[in-house]
Amino acid sequence: MAEYKLGEIEMKFAELIWENEPIQSGELALLSLKELNWKRTTTYTVLKRLCDKGIFKNEKGMVSSLLSKQLFQAKQSEEFVEGTFGGSLPDFVAAFISQKKLSEEEIEELKRIIEGK
């Protein structure tokens, strides 16, 4: 199973890509300088790392995602539930709601999701 853990800085960089894709790698380097205060070499190093993880691709200088942000978050969540709760979604939900009271709207939304509506 691939590992979908990103550090805080990697996640900010991934957000930049998702918000601007497809994007030329040179343009991404300029955006990273502006938004993250990164040098070009830092941008390319982190980009390569995220490409090696299978999240993004850089083909002929054009950067785009292999995983949408939503799919990436789903895979992160699955990995977390598997590692922390032995894959038990009910155990995860029980732990979550024991710390946070859900509103009626949230409960109804969860019911719709579970029922596939």
Annotate each language-model stretch with its function.
Residues 1-16, 71-72, 83:
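Short alpha-helical segments that sit at the start of domains
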Residues 17-21:
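Short helix-to-turn junction characteristic of helix-turn-helix DNA-binding domains
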Residues 22-32:
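Short acidic, hydrophobic short linear motifs in intrinsically disordered regions
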Residues 44-48:
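Short, hydrophobic-biased segments on the C-terminal half of alpha helices
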Residues 51-61:
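A short, conserved structural fragment
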Residues 61-68:
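Minor-groove-contacting beta-hairpin "wing" of winged helix-turn-helix DNA-binding domains
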